[in-house]
Protein backbone atom coordinates (compact mmCIF):
# COMPACT_ATOMS: atom_id res chain seq x y z
CA UNK A 1 0.00 0.00 0.00
CA UNK A 2 1.38 3.45 -0.83
CA UNK A 3 2.62 5.58 2.04
CA UNK A 4 0.35 8.58 2.51
CA UNK A 5 -0.22 11.57 4.79
CA UNK A 6 3.33 12.86 4.25
CA UNK A 7 4.67 16.36 4.05
CA UNK A 8 7.14 17.22 1.30
CA UNK A 9 9.91 17.41 3.90
CA UNK A 10 9.13 13.90 5.17
CA UNK A 11 8.96 12.51 1.63
CA UNK A 12 12.27 14.16 0.71
CA UNK A 13 13.96 12.97 3.92
CA UNK A 14 12.83 9.39 3.33
CA UNK A 15 13.99 9.45 -0.28
CA UNK A 16 17.45 10.66 0.76
CA UNK A 17 17.63 8.12 3.60
CA UNK A 18 16.79 5.35 1.11
CA UNK A 19 19.55 6.51 -1.27
CA UNK A 20 17.09 7.91 -3.80
CA UNK A 21 15.42 11.25 -4.46
CA UNK A 22 12.05 12.64 -5.41
CA UNK A 23 11.56 13.03 -9.17
CA UNK A 24 11.32 16.49 -10.63
CA UNK A 25 7.94 17.50 -11.99
CA UNK A 26 9.21 17.11 -15.55
CA UNK A 27 10.71 13.66 -14.89
CA UNK A 28 7.36 12.55 -13.45
CA UNK A 29 5.45 13.94 -16.44
CA UNK A 30 7.86 12.38 -18.92
CA UNK A 31 7.53 8.96 -17.25
CA UNK A 32 3.73 9.26 -17.15
CA UNK A 33 3.38 10.28 -20.78
CA UNK A 34 5.89 7.70 -22.04
CA UNK A 35 4.42 4.81 -20.08
CA UNK A 36 2.05 3.33 -22.66
CA UNK A 37 0.73 0.26 -20.87
CA UNK A 38 -1.17 2.14 -18.16
CA UNK A 39 -1.39 -0.87 -15.88
CA UNK A 40 -4.57 -1.07 -13.86
CA UNK A 41 -4.36 -0.67 -10.11
CA UNK A 42 -6.07 -3.92 -9.26
CA UNK A 43 -7.80 -4.27 -5.92
CA UNK A 44 -7.89 -8.05 -5.85
CA UNK A 45 -11.65 -7.94 -6.36
CA UNK A 46 -13.82 -8.27 -9.42
CA UNK A 47 -13.98 -4.47 -9.60
CA UNK A 48 -12.24 -2.96 -12.56
CA UNK A 49 -10.59 0.42 -11.93
CA UNK A 50 -12.11 3.38 -13.72
CA UNK A 51 -10.50 4.60 -16.90
CA UNK A 52 -11.07 7.69 -18.96
CA UNK A 53 -13.14 7.33 -22.12
CA UNK A 54 -11.37 8.31 -25.31
CA UNK A 55 -13.86 11.15 -25.77
CA UNK A 56 -12.92 12.67 -22.39
CA UNK A 57 -11.39 16.17 -22.52
CA UNK A 58 -8.66 14.85 -20.22
CA UNK A 59 -7.78 11.97 -22.53
CA UNK A 60 -4.34 12.62 -23.99
CA UNK A 61 -2.39 11.01 -26.80
CA UNK A 62 -5.13 8.37 -27.24
CA UNK A 63 -3.89 6.70 -24.04
CA UNK A 64 -6.19 5.27 -21.42
CA UNK A 65 -5.46 6.36 -17.86
CA UNK A 66 -6.55 3.86 -15.24
CA UNK A 67 -6.46 3.89 -11.49
CA UNK A 68 -8.37 3.85 -8.24
CA UNK A 69 -10.56 6.88 -8.74
CA UNK A 70 -13.53 8.30 -6.89
CA UNK A 71 -15.84 6.57 -9.35
CA UNK A 72 -14.64 3.08 -8.31
CA UNK A 73 -15.63 3.56 -4.68
CA UNK A 74 -12.05 2.70 -3.63
CA UNK A 75 -11.45 5.67 -1.34
CA UNK A 76 -8.15 4.42 0.03
CA UNK A 77 -4.87 3.47 -1.63
CA UNK A 78 -4.79 -0.09 -2.96
CA UNK A 79 -1.51 -1.89 -3.74
CA UNK A 80 -0.68 -2.94 -7.27
CA UNK A 81 -0.75 -6.67 -7.94
CA UNK A 82 2.02 -6.93 -10.53
CA UNK A 83 5.54 -5.61 -10.82
CA UNK A 84 5.64 -4.88 -14.54
CA UNK A 85 6.61 -1.36 -15.52
CA UNK A 86 5.57 1.79 -13.73
CA UNK A 87 2.74 1.23 -11.29
CA UNK A 88 0.17 3.38 -9.54
CA UNK A 89 0.92 6.62 -11.35
CA UNK A 90 -2.70 7.70 -11.08
CA UNK A 91 -5.46 7.33 -8.55
CA UNK A 92 -3.93 6.33 -5.22
CA UNK A 93 -2.08 9.34 -3.78
CA UNK A 94 -0.79 12.63 -5.12
CA UNK A 95 2.98 12.19 -5.38
CA UNK A 96 5.38 14.89 -4.17
CA UNK A 97 7.95 16.06 -6.70
CA UNK A 98 11.18 17.94 -6.09
CA UNK A 99 9.84 20.95 -8.02
CA UNK A 100 8.49 24.27 -6.76
CA UNK A 101 5.16 25.32 -8.24
CA UNK A 102 6.22 27.89 -10.81
CA UNK A 103 5.03 28.63 -14.30
CA UNK A 104 5.94 26.14 -17.03
CA UNK A 105 9.00 27.18 -19.05
CA UNK A 106 7.85 29.80 -21.53
CA UNK A 107 4.59 30.47 -19.66
CA UNK A 108 3.41 34.07 -19.91
CA UNK A 109 0.04 35.14 -18.50
CA UNK A 110 -2.34 37.19 -20.57
CA UNK A 111 -2.19 40.90 -19.75
CA UNK A 112 -4.16 41.59 -16.56
CA UNK A 113 -4.81 37.91 -15.81
CA UNK A 114 -3.46 35.97 -12.87
CA UNK A 115 -3.70 32.78 -14.92
CA UNK A 116 -2.45 29.47 -13.57
CA UNK A 117 0.49 30.94 -11.72
CA UNK A 118 0.47 33.81 -9.25
CA UNK A 119 4.05 34.14 -8.01
CA UNK A 120 3.08 35.97 -4.82
CA UNK A 121 0.79 33.15 -3.63
CA UNK A 122 2.54 30.19 -5.23
CA UNK A 123 6.16 30.98 -4.34
CA UNK A 124 6.24 28.56 -1.41
CA UNK A 125 4.20 25.70 -2.90
CA UNK A 126 5.57 22.36 -4.16
CA UNK A 127 4.20 20.35 -7.11
CA UNK A 128 2.36 17.05 -6.64
CA UNK A 129 1.46 14.79 -9.56
CA UNK A 130 -0.76 11.78 -10.24
CA UNK A 131 -4.08 12.31 -8.50
CA UNK A 132 -5.52 10.49 -5.51
CA UNK A 133 -8.23 7.92 -4.93
CA UNK A 134 -10.70 10.78 -4.37
CA UNK A 135 -9.75 12.72 -7.50
CA UNK A 136 -12.43 12.42 -10.19
CA UNK A 137 -11.08 10.42 -13.15
CA UNK A 138 -12.10 13.24 -15.50
CA UNK A 139 -9.54 15.52 -13.81
CA UNK A 140 -6.62 13.13 -14.26
CA UNK A 141 -4.08 13.45 -17.05
CA UNK A 142 -0.28 13.14 -17.15
CA UNK A 143 0.11 16.93 -17.30
CA UNK A 144 -2.26 17.80 -14.43
CA UNK A 145 -0.49 19.73 -11.67
CA UNK A 146 -1.41 20.08 -8.03
CA UNK A 147 0.38 22.02 -5.31
CA UNK A 148 0.58 22.12 -1.54
CA UNK A 149 2.66 23.83 1.15
CA UNK A 150 5.78 21.69 1.78
CA UNK A 151 5.44 21.51 5.58
CA UNK A 152 1.81 20.38 5.53
CA UNK A 153 0.79 16.74 5.82
CA UNK A 154 -2.12 15.84 3.61
CA UNK A 155 -3.99 12.55 3.75
CA UNK A 156 -3.84 12.20 -0.03
CA UNK A 157 -0.12 12.93 -0.49
CA UNK A 158 2.58 10.32 -0.90
CA UNK A 159 5.83 9.78 -2.74
CA UNK A 160 7.54 8.09 -5.65
CA UNK A 161 11.27 7.46 -5.53
CA UNK A 162 13.65 8.30 -8.36
CA UNK A 163 17.26 7.40 -8.91
CA UNK A 164 19.77 8.78 -11.38
CA UNK A 165 20.82 6.45 -14.17
CA UNK A 166 24.42 5.23 -13.86
CA UNK A 167 26.89 7.47 -15.64
CA UNK A 168 28.45 5.96 -18.73
CA UNK A 169 32.23 5.63 -18.59
Model-predicted regions and their roles:
Residues 115-120, 146-153:
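Short proline/glycine-enriched turn/loop segments at secondary-structure junctions
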Residues 129, 136, 142-150, 157-159:
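Extended alpha-helical regions
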Residues 153-169:
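Short, structured beta-strand segments at or near domain termini in extracellular proteins/domains
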Residues 1-141:
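Functional-site microenvironments in short loops/helix caps that host divalent-cation chemistry
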